[in-house]
Regions:
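N-terminal leader/targeting and accessory segments in enzymes
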Residues: 1-93, 97, 275, 387
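Nucleotide phosphate-binding/pyrophosphate-handling subdomain across enzymes
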Residues: 2-5, 15-25, 132, 267-373
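Phosphate-binding loop of NTP-binding sites
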Residues: 4, 23-24, 59-63, 72-215, ...
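Residues in the short beta-alpha loop(s) of Rossmann-like NAD(P)-binding domains
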Residues: 12, 35, 139, 216-217, ...
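Short internal beta-strands
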Residues: 28-34, 211-215, 351-352, 371-380
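Short beta-strand "acidic-cap" motif of Rossmann-like dinucleotide-binding folds
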Residues: 29-33, 134-135, 156, 235, ...
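C-terminal helical cap/extension that packs against the catalytic core
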Residues: 42-43, 362-417
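Beta-strand->loop->alpha-helix junctions that form or flank phosphate-binding loops
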Residues: 55-56, 92-96, 229-248, 303-305, ...
Length: 448
């Protein structure tokens, strides 16, 4: 019998993992990438005798596929995808494909902001509790690679809307939806499409599964009834009492999974390692998931108080001459920057700008007027930023490198100020990615 042909588009982390798993399951595998393939992935393909091509898509080969697994970074509108859809070849993503070959518990985490933090925190709790848990999706390793070579009992998955779009049969045992605010509107015809994409994390869930979501998020609250959700709901809120679920009472996180008088779990927000209102939400979501899995309360408390977040997320990394430097380069949209500003009660010099994804800066206006004494624009086109804030910020300066941004901001700062890199924009105009932007910022500060 002829082997089923699988073509994998995109040879990054997820593509390489999908290729290795497909090969292990007996498929005829071909990997195609329109760009250059990194040496580490070429080595993986060679070791596993997987055919590949780079810097091109040979359509003749691609269109022979029985199934195509595409990288989440490839838009459905891409020319290569249009031809695949015309031939009615089934298309799925790496997570969807990998989930067919494992019966392990899946914890899926999505939302516009806070995904990585909540995913890392949830994984930290599971690991410390002694569970064999893998970290995959948008963070950590490829799920397919782990399923093929290093299987775990639990997988904690950070899921972007693009990854969710490529799923049909995937089911989360525990689904977490943190928030929904306008983002990636360059990839979606409308905000409604983006909302539907985020809610699709609940697809295929049954009453035996859990859906943890933020009750305070207006978009989630307004759209909840329009989605047919079968899972057990566990809302979390800092504004009202939610049972079953999590809520705040006198600065105590209270989790009550059953409708009993006695709470399942309590902890003071002052003991959380992650500070700021948005991080109370992230901590609540992870703690509810951990309680559903019956992890011991002491372990959850320890993890919520000793967790160290990933780089580039409100990362306070230096104090020079009484000025605090904070790297929040991961803030690639306006809402992330709103959360960052909301966390500070001292004068802020804000480094803002980059590739604008259709930002509405009016959301930031009140906080900027209240807290920001100067704005340093780090991007090629800053007209929108000047227009949005010229009325309430006297000093707005344009710069074109991280070194220049740090030198300018330092010159404007006085003791007790915070210099905050929280750009509200993507980074591709001046930097490789947000990590590169954050590291260049930190290097420039260290050179002061």
């Amino acid at each position: 019998m002829e082997k089923k042909k699988i073509v994998i588009l995109g040879a990054g982390e997820s593509g390489a993992g999908a290729a290795v798993l497909a090969k292990a399951k007996g498929y005829d595998v071909f990997v195609s990438d329109s760009g250059a393939i990194k040496d580490k992935y070429k080595t993986i393909f060679s070791e596993n005798k997987i055919a590949y091509e780079e810097k091109q898509h040979t359509m003749e080969k691609i269109l022979q596929a029985d199934e195509v697994i595409k990288s989440p970074g490839i838009p459905s509108k891409a020319p290569v995808m249009k031809k695949i859809y015309e031939k009615k070849i089934p298309v799925s993503g790496e997570i969807e494909f990998a989930s067919r070959y494992t019966k392990s518990k899946m914890i899926g985490i999505t939302g516009t902001n806070g995904k990585t933090t909540t995913t890392l925190l949830t994984h930290h709790i599971l690991t410390k509790a002694g569970l064999k848990a893998g970290l995959a999706g948008n963070v950590g390793h490829s799920l397919a690679m782990m399923v093929a070579q290093d299987p775990r009992d639990y997988y904690v998955l950070e899921l972007s809307s693009f990854q969710l779009d490529d799923m049909k049969t995937f089911k989360a045992d525990i689904a977490i939806l943190l928030n929904i605010t306008p983002d990636h509107l360059d990839r979606y015809p409308s905000f409604e499409n983006y909302i539907d994409s985020k809610f699709s994390i609940t697809r295929n869930q049954t009453s035996a599964d859990a859906f943890i979501y933020c009750e305070d998020d207006l978009v989630i609250a307004e759209n909840l009834s329009q989605h047919n959700i079968s899972a057990q709901p566990y809302p979390f809120s800092i504004k009202k009492k939610t049972i079953p679920g999590a809520y705040l009472d006198n600065n105590e996180i209270i989790i009550n999974l059953k409708n009993h008088q006695n709470p399942t779990f309590t902890m003071s927000i002052h003991n959380l390692s992650l500070q700021g209102r948005h991080n109370i939400y992230n901590s609540m979501a992870a703690a509810v998931a951990a309680n559903i899995l019956n992890i011991r309360k002491e372990v959850i408390r320890d993890c919520l108080s000793d967790f160290r977040n990933a780089e580039h997320r409100l990362e306070h990394f230096a104090t020079v001459h009484g000025v605090d430097y904070v790297n929040d380069s991961k803030a690639t949209n306006v809402n992330s920057t709103w959360y960052a500003l909301e966390s500070y009660h001292r004068p802020v010099i804000l480094i803002l700008g980059g590739v604008d994804k259709g930002n509405d800066y009016s959301i930031l206006k009140d906080l900027v007027c209240e807290k920001v004494k100067a704005i340093v624009c780090l991007g090629k086109d800053n007209k929108k930023i000047h227009k949005a804030f010229k009325d309430c910020v006297k000093m707005i300066v344009d710069v074109s490198s991280a070194d220049e941004a740090v030198a300018t901001a330092s010159g404007l700062a006085t003791k007790g100020d915070v210099i905050l890199l929280s750009p509200a924009c993507a980074s591709f105009d001046l930097f490789e990615n947000y990590e590169d932007r954050g590291r260049q910022f930190k290097r420039a500060v260290k050179a002061l």
